[in-house]
């Protein structure tokens, strides 16, 4: 007898606690977490894990700032124009698209393609209903390609035009 995927999925979702098992009943009476496994989130997470994570984060930030402090740049000169004016780091990919486009119309078209592409993200995400990224190959591939292109354009924006294709490596 073949069991359909729908029956297996429904059975996995509607799984009930085995109240005939005395070990399970004992754990539930001691309030040992949800269903039959784990430990309660209160007070363990709030009283132990949160302070450890907060103190660890503060320690990492202080350690990095002591080991490698941010250097102070040259003083500003209001009468000298910088050699190359760059936008903030989060605008590097868009700036680089405009910089490498051969004409203004193509640059505007490429810039408008970014939000149009983002409009299609929900439709790409709904191709597959799984939550695991390894079982959603279309969405994972689109995300990885988009991330790599954005990083490539962002790094290339900081380089001169003759070196951006190879990112200055060759």
Curated annotation (Swiss-Prot):
| InterPro entries per the UniProt record, alphabetical | Cyt_b/b6_C, Cyt_b/b6_C_sf, Cyt_b6/f_cplx_suIV, Cytochrome_b_C_euk/bac
What Pfam family is a match, any one?
Cytochrom_B_C
The record's NCBIfam families line, in alphabetical order, gives: cytb6_f_IV
Q: Which GO terms describe its molecular function?
A: electron transporter, transferring electrons within cytochrome b6/f complex of photosystem II activity; electron transporter, transferring electrons within the cyclic electron transport pathway of photosynthesis activity; oxidoreductase activity
Keywords in alphabetical order: Electron transport, Membrane, Photosynthesis, Thylakoid, Transmembrane, Transmembrane helix, Transport
Name recorded for this polypeptide:
Cytochrome b6-f complex subunit 4
Q: Where are the transmembrane segments?
A: 46-66, 105-125, 141-161
Among the GO biological process terms of this entry, one is: photosynthetic electron transport chain
**What species is given as this protein's source?**
Synechococcus sp. (strain JA-2-3B'a(2-13)) (Cyanobacteria bacterium Yellowstone B-Prime)
- What is the membrane topology here? Multi-pass membrane protein
Question: Oligomeric state and partners?
Answer: The 4 large subunits of the cytochrome b6-f complex are cytochrome b6, subunit IV (17 kDa polypeptide, PetD), cytochrome f and the Rieske protein, while the 4 small subunits are PetG, PetL, PetM and PetN. The complex functions as a dimer.
Q: So what family is this one in?
A: Belongs to the cytochrome b family. PetD subfamily.
Q: What is its main location?
A: membrane
Q: Where in the cell is it found?
A: Cellular thylakoid membrane
Identify one Gene Ontology CC term for this UniProt entry: plasma membrane-derived thylakoid membrane
For this protein, the record's HAMAP family field holds:
Cytb6_f_subIV
What does this gene product do? Answer: Component of the cytochrome b6-f complex, which mediates electron transfer between photosystem II (PSII) and photosystem I (PSI), cyclic electron flow around PSI, and state transitions.
